[in-house]
Amino acid sequence: MDVTTRREAPLPPPAPHVPGFASPALDYERLDHADPGAILSWAADSIPQLALATSFQSSGLVLLHLLQDIRPDLPVLFLDTGFHFPETLAFASEMTRKWNLNLVTLRGEHGSPERQAEIYGPALYKRDPDKCCAINKVAPLQRALENYDGWISGIRRDQSPLRAATPTVEAQMLPSGKEILKIHPLANWSKADVAAYVEANGIPSHPLLEQGFASIGCSPCTRAVRSGEAERDGRWDGLGKTECGIHSFGKVHGPMETEAEQ
């Protein structure tokens, strides 16, 4: 399959169980072997209220580019944690203007790092990074997802051992008890596939990639990767943490688990 093209042949829609997603009647094997464009088309046609979440890195940009032909007005959820690199915020604004994205910015309940420090003390991201991520990423995303029936993510199986079993589609249960679908159209793609698509389609890249960063999160918890390191080895260096939590909460169907859940 030529990954550099926008879309392959459309996927014949499996029998969806859309209302409530209590027990998704989905042909997981067929979806797992479909190309990303077909998966996105299926999701756009089958899921009434759908959104995509991205931090404007390469995988997310590939999905946004594909969606220009499928659902250009799809809500794009962006978690503004208050700790992003200035380059991330500037690039997100640039791509939002360039592609006329329907951007929905999400923020934690405290609104700013300064207010968070007043409540929890300074540098919570060092003392309790799980709590910092829960406040600024997991909780605001969970609140936003109450408005949707499904969401799309750009995570891939080759990014880390914890993501190696990522399904193309899985169900998540929100704290309220609402069950939604989570779609990973690029689960089967490699980093090289993403790079090839980006180059072939002239998609701009996050400026920090040129400075040795491979996976870009909040500035206090992200460094450039060293020679021989994996893509996500620059995240939460020395903190015993590899995921922020937005890809592991409330799973109902799908094999991906965090170490704590295994």
Residue ranges, per PLM feature:
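Nucleotide-activated chemistry modules centered on ATP-dependent adenylation/adenylyltransferase
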Residues: D2-Q262
